Amino acid sequence: MSNKKSSTSFLVQGSILAMASIISRIIGLVYRIPLTAIIGNKGNDYYGCAFEIYNILLIISSYSLPLAVSKLVSADMSLGRKKNVYRILKCALIFGLVSGTIAALILFFWAEFITGTIMKTPYSIFAVKVLVPTLIVVAVLGVMRGFFQGLGTMMPSAVSQILEQIANAIVSVWAAYVLYSYGTKVGAVLGNTENYAAAYGAAGGTLGTGTGAVVGLLFASFVLLAYLSVFKRQMKRERRAKVDSYSYIFKILFITIIPVLMSTTIYNCNAILDQAIFKNIANLQGYSANDISEWNGIYTGKYKTLINVPISIASALAASSVPALTAAYTNGKKEAVRSQINTAIRFIMVVAFPCAVGMGVLASPILQLLFRDSSELAASMLQLGAVSIVFFSLSTLSNGLLQGINRMREPVKNALIALVLHIGLLVVLMYAFQLNIYAVVYANAFFGLLMCVLNAHSVKKYSGYRQEIRRTFVIPGISALIMGVAVYLSYQLALYLFRVNAIATVFSIFIGVIVYAVVLLLLKGLTEEEILKFPKGAALVRLARKMHLLR
């Protein structure tokens, strides 16, 4: 396969997963609107706290499984070892079931200590307990998704992801409504209506997560069983196949998982550390429990929810780049490796810059449109933290790139350095400058920036890739700034004419997309060859030619 075909294929597969991630995030964003209306900022605090605890145990138990499985499957498929691929699948399913069960037991028995003593959010225990069985389901589902990604097809993962989120959305809102009402009655009896209503409502929200995971697992299982009937016939035609022992596969699986596990744990535990440090220091500084809960509820329920939508594109592209890079790296195709790294970084920067600028410019209108929140605090957080979209998009992608070229320890080392410095900055901002929740926003963005710099150095060192600056960063950045001006002016004009925030916001976003695309092409930020690598690239090229934007 040529470099061009290789990078095109992996970008198309990555785009499929990215589109599924975007759709899933949009569904997630949409259902968070009625969910927030039901449980409020305090309920969002309990909900967010429960998820941070759940996420850490998910990361430790099975988050790295899809990546590890896709790496091993991709490497063996590139060598034609299908019987070994089947063994990898069986071993990974056993591994996922065991690790998920252990994590579920830990969460069940330690939930009270973690929520009350460490996180200072005792009422989140109801939501945490609901999430316990989900750890087992997600572990097995992750293995299946990793298997398909290793085969080079993202469609089963993409469809299961969307189905999972649809079920999640429906059940979350319904269960939150029902349990919030029940919590109100319980709270009335116990003399604490507000906290118990929010706590039970948050538990209802987490019930949707487990239900969605079960739906995703059922779909993935159906596709896997259908595929294996064909795959087993292909295995029979494989002659003189060298098959690794089960003990060896478990060993390799474990060796592959550990570095990924360490890097993802360190990379993602900054969120739970942020909450713990913020709440403990804010408590020592004399802020009321209600204020702390409100601030953190806005941060986790609104700010993080919005910021994570564009970052999910980078996560999807990172997931798709690992098996493609592993296959190229295993076969010694250095030029193909560098080509795919270049394609992935350029694609993600073209998306991240306008998302960051747009989110910053339209912070207040978006919050009013989605959450009916016109508070200065929420808007300021989004304006100040929008730049982290660029940082986390690039750092998330570069983690995947390093793992794809078998430099598993580099993200671990880089994440550890960034985490230590990030915690230091957070403590200084909280104590010396008393920035309360803004300190978390600044420190979080700083963590993403450090990961970008450190990972970029590692990618260059181990792949020989030299980063091009002008077309990758400067032109998308300038195009996004021009777009930002157009978005601001068009919003003000539409608001003046129609006096309706929803119309003005949607109109300004539409104008922003057009302006960004036009300026990007006029500044030669994308070539015709690069556009052709995108899904529906030929149609985009024809449109650009008709508008005389390509020569």
Give the positions of each predicted feature.
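Membrane-interface junctions at transmembrane-helix termini in multi-pass inner-membrane proteins
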Residues: 138-161, 387-417
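Signature of the first transmembrane helix
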Residues: 9-67, 104, 135, 258-277
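Membrane-proximal transmembrane or re-entrant/amphipathic helices at the cytosolic face
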Residues: 489-551
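Interfacial/gating helices of multi-pass transporter permease domains
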Residues: 36-56, 123, 195-203, 249-256, ...
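Membrane-interface helix-loop junctions in multi-pass transport and translocation proteins
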Residues: 155, 166-223, 409, 419-453, ...
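Helix-loop junctions and terminal segments of transmembrane helices
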Residues: 63-78, 311-332, 345
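N-terminal membrane topogenesis motif
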Residues: 1-27, 83, 87, 240-267, ...
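Interfacial segments at transmembrane-helix termini and the short loops linking adjacent helices
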Residues: 112-131, 359-389
